[in-house]
């Protein structure tokens, strides 16, 4: 799984060298942000169901057409799948917070996601909207410290950009 540490070590090994000063500074910065990332991961895990429901509800309220026949949320089974997928993205963000890199999202969430959604005729816009709602609603200190919130929002932005 890709993280800052594994990326640095892999690049240095491929070049047949030791990590450079810049490499080591990147690793050090990543380690210094670890406490904030772990706080964000803990808070997200504790509130995952509520965050997922609130974001999904906001999305379906903004795009009520999604519940019409022939759309992604035309019946409760499909609505439940939308919430499941949204929860999956949030869980992957949790994993990214733990490892300190985008590996979980890259490997399990983004690679091919747009192609799968396109093939199945599912729009990515509602997922982007739900994740954007989550990003914009989260605040410090209500939800987590400012540093933890910064880390959380950076991974939300990453997946939002990837699905846009």
Swiss-Prot record:
A matching Pfam family: Phycobilisome
Membrane topology listed for this record: Peripheral membrane protein
List of residues binding (2R,3E)-phycoerythrobilin 1: 82
Primary localization: membrane
GO biological process: photosynthesis
Alphabetically ordered keywords of this record: Antenna complex, Bile pigment, Chromophore, Electron transport, Membrane, Photosynthesis, Phycobilisome, Thylakoid, Transport
InterPro entries, per database record: Globin-like_sf, Phycobilisome_asu/bsu, Phycobilisome_asu/bsu_sf
Ubl conjugation recorded as keyword: no
Transport among keywords: yes
Domain of life: Bacteria
Gene3D superfamilies: Phycocyanins
PTMs per UniProt: Contains one covalently linked bilin chromophore.
GO CC terms of this entry: phycobilisome; plasma membrane-derived thylakoid membrane
Family the UniProt entry places it in: Belongs to the phycobiliprotein family.
Name of the protein described by the UniProt record: C-phycoerythrin class 1 subunit alpha
Organism: Synechococcus sp. (strain WH7803)
Organismal lineage: Bacteria, Bacillati, Cyanobacteriota, Cyanophyceae, Synechococcales
UniProt gene name: cpeA
């Amino acid at each position: 799984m890709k993280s800052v540490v594994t990326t640095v070590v892999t690049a240095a090994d491929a070049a047949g060298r030791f990590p450079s000063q810049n490499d080591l500074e990147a690793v050090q910065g990543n380690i210094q942000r670890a406490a904030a990332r772990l706080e964000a991961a803990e808070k997200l895990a504790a509130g995952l169901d509520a965050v997922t429901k609130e974001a999904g509800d906001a999305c379906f309220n903004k795009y009520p057409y999604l519940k019409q026949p022939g759309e992604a949320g035309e019946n409760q089974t499909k609505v439940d799948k939308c919430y499941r997928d949204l929860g999956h993205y949030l869980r992957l963000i949790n994993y990214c917070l733990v490892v300190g890199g985008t590996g979980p999202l890259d490997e399990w969430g983004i690679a091919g996601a747009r192609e799968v959604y396109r093939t199945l005729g599912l729009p990515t816009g509602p997922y982007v909207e739900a994740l954007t709602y989550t990003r914009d609603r989260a605040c410090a200190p209500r939800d987590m410290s400012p540093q933890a919130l910064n880390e959380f929002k950076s991974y939300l932005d990453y997946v939002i950009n990837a699905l846009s």
